[in-house]
Amino acid sequence: MKRQGGYVPARGDAVWITLDPQAGHEQTGRRPALVLSPATYNGRVGLALLCPITSQVKGYPFEVALPNGLAIAGVALADQVKSLDWRARKASRICAVPEDVIVQVLRRLNVLLAGTA
């Protein structure tokens, strides 16, 4: 999504964003991430809910594979959701991710939040 001041991340966007500082097993550095929160929230609040994308596929149950043919490859890590200031961390759009990927990520996240299987 674009607005008068420039790009605002929208749900379903894959973006480059800086994840530092990090601790423990968290992803670090300037990395791709998947935006889960809607552009209306992101633009108004200046934060976005994102999950990192990695090319290191391990077969972990909370990984959601990105389809072939996108400008980015790998898996979204649904259990590593972060709320980040996308302006301060210089988010830039890579591409749009298909809706079915977003649905899969949200379902896996729901397992953690609601305790459902």
Residue ranges and their predicted role:
Residues 1-117:
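Conserved functional hotspots at enzyme active or ligand-binding sites that engage polyanionic ligands
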